Amino acid sequence: MASGFLLWPVLLVSFSVNAVEPISLYNLFTSAVNRAQHLHTLAAEIYKEFERSIPPEAHRQLSKTSPLAGCYSDSIPTPTGKDETQEKSDGYLLRISSALIQSWVYPLKTLSDAFSNSLMFGTSDGIFDKLEDLNKGINELMKVVGDGGIYIEDVRNLRYENFDVHLRNDAGLMKNYGLLACFKKDMHKVETYLKVTKCRRFVESNCTL
């Protein structure tokens, strides 16, 4: 795992006792937000790189269809807008964030294998480990904040059947284009939800969605 992701073990020591010092919780929230921002940035870069690799004619065809139609994670009950997000509890938003991350375990493994020789993943080594690391941090936050009292079906073993590794035709190209668009969208959601939960507990100047 990359050295930049070795902070969790130090921070998690504070959770072994009953009382959690505010500064430790603040640092844990800050680390989670920073990691979510990093993953969202990576997702956007990978998406742009894929767009640049598409032939002009294929790109014109793809532009006629929404790449976000039928995202795999649509089955996860995420808030649909700013107002609904603000209405949800911190625990709920953390639980939803964890579910979104877990839903990408299989697709990201497949995606990484498919584009292992591409510049698309040249700047995102260990992206799977980064997802796992962020999820561990969110789970530790839920030990303190709670999980919103909601049950979400385990999404780790589900499969993203629309993913086409071999890009055999335009249909396969569209599937992969859609997959990357969905990944970017979901990482943006996770970043947003973590920012909201942090801002509620530690009043900051930038709390807007």
Curated annotation (Swiss-Prot):
Annotated localization: Secreted
Superkingdom assignment: Eukaryota
TM annotation in the entry: none
The keyword Signal appears for this protein: yes
Pfam families per the UniProt record, alphabetical: Hormone_1 (PF00103)
Keywords attached to this entry: Disulfide bond, Hormone, Metal-binding, Secreted, Signal, Zinc
CDD domains linked to this entry: somatotropin_like
Signal peptide: 1-19
Official protein name in the record: Somatotropin-1
Upper classification of the organism: Eukaryota, Metazoa, Chordata, Craniata, Vertebrata
Gene, per the UniProt record: gh1
